[in-house]
């Protein structure tokens, strides 16, 4: 689908379904309080989607870990142990919330909150389906990357506020790692934005739609897209502190990293924020390179597979499944690859990924200029 077709046909159809469009339409003839209230009510499903992804990411981690080790994992609480995570939340709610006497109480308390807010706010710009988009921003991709990077503030507050040398070491490692890997990750995403000609995640998704299914996805349209795709996926592992980049939480060196001193629900919030970041980076890579809500199935003759598997409900299904696939790969790698050393981590970022990211940026620009 061309940019002209997008502006003439698709945008009026899709933009009218976003939550902020509903608010703008109501603001013209109602008091300001009603649109705000309706917007909050309409955002409730977004809250449930985010909490569902965060909560059952823990369950998925346990089951996948058990599968890798030829175990069963949680089985007792609910069918197949599906309520185990809820039981753990109830347990953590009853635990004592301990604040070390020597800790900076303000920083110690706000650290987990900043982490969780950073993970949750990024969900607002994710286009889950043609009929459900929290906010369609013309800089949506930039917003998502920036909000996810907000975790640096929470991590540093948690590590410094704990007044514990292991927590501080873990926080410094994590901040250095995240800030470093933001560079190749951002350049890789710019390659996707260059192919689409926009930073609006909704438009990026629409431009990858078509009856040929996966053939319209940028990963298959442009052979160069495989390079930024792999660069962003590797960098996203480092940004989410997943193996083999889980150096900030190295148990044998730092006990538990920057959240060593946390207990009760503060510990749970930090844990949930990590799974929120995992889903967020997985959703971003699905939107930019794999068509987001678009069905990968093509229309083949009389079998209109793409037509049958498109729409609001199917759109949400596809983007969630694509996101869960990358989450599965992240969990799989945890039990496959050994942890890197700090020097190896930085070498990979500055000497390998960053140069290749610049190369992919130049190649993508040349492809967009000279290949019709």
Curated annotation (Swiss-Prot):
Q: Kindly list the residue ranges recorded as spanning the membrane.
A: 34-54, 106-126, 139-159, 178-198, 217-237, 278-298, 313-333, 352-372
The cellular location(s) given in this protein's UniProt record come to: Cell inner membrane
Please cite one Gene Ontology biological process associated with this protein: aerobic respiration
Matches recorded under InterPro entries: NADH_UbQ_OxRdtase_su1/FPO, NADH_UbQ_OxRdtase_su1_CS
The organism's place on the tree of life at top rank: Bacteria
Q: Which reaction does it catalyse?
A: a quinone + NADH + 5 H(+)(in) = a quinol + NAD(+) + 4 H(+)(out)
In Swiss-Prot or TrEMBL terms, this protein is called NADH-quinone oxidoreductase subunit H
User: To which species is this protein native?
Assistant: Chlorobium chlorochromatii (strain CaD3)
Q: What is the lineage of its organism?
A: Bacteria, Pseudomonadati, Chlorobiota, Chlorobiia, Chlorobiales
């Amino acid at each position: 689908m061309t940019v002209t077709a997008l502006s003439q046909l698709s945008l009026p159809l899709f933009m009218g379904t976003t939550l902020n469009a509903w608010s703008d339409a109501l603001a013209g003839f109602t008091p300001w309080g009603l649109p705000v209230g309706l917007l909050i009510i309409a955002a409730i499903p977004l809250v449930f989607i985010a909490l569902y992804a965060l909560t059952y990411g823990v369950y998925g981690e346990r089951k996948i870990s058990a599968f890798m080790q030829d175990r069963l994992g949680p089985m007792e609480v609910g069918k197949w142990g599906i309520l185990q995570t809820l039981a753990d939340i109830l347990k953590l709610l009853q635990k004592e919330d301990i604040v070390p006497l020597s800790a900076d109480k303000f920083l110690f308390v706000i650290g987990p909150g900043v982490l969780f807010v950073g993970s949750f706010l990024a969900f607002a710009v994710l286009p889950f389906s043609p009929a459900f988009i929290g906010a369609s921003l013309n800089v949506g991709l930039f917003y998502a990357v920036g909000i996810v990077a907000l975790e640096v503030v929470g991590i540093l507050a948690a590590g410094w506020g704990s007044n514990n040398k292991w927590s501080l070491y873990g926080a410094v490692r994590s901040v250095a790692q995240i800030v470093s890997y933001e560079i190749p990750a951002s350049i890789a995403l710019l390659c996707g934005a260059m192919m689409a000609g926009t930073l609006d995640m909704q438009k990026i998704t629409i431009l990858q739609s078509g009856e040929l299914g996966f053939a319209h996805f940028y990963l298959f349209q442009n052979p160069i897209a495989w390079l930024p795709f792999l660069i962003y996926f590797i960098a996203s592992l480092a940004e989410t502190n997943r193996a083999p980049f889980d150096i900030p939480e190295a148990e044998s060196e730092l006990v538990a990293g920057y959240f060593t001193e946390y207990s009760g629900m503060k510990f749970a919030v930090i844990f949930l924020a990590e799974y929120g970041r995992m889903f967020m980076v997985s959703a971003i890579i699905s939107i930019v390179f794999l068509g987001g809500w678009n069905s990968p199935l093509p229309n083949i003759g009389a079998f209109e597979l793409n037509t049958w598997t498109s729409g609001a409900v199917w759109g949400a299904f596809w983007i969630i499944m694509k996101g869960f696939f990358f989450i599965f790969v992240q969990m799989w790698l945890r039990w496959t690859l050994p942890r890197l050393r700090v020097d190896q981590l930085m070498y990979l970022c500055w000497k390998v990924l960053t140069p290749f990211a610049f190369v992919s940026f130049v190649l993508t620009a040349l492809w967009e200029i000279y290949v019709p």
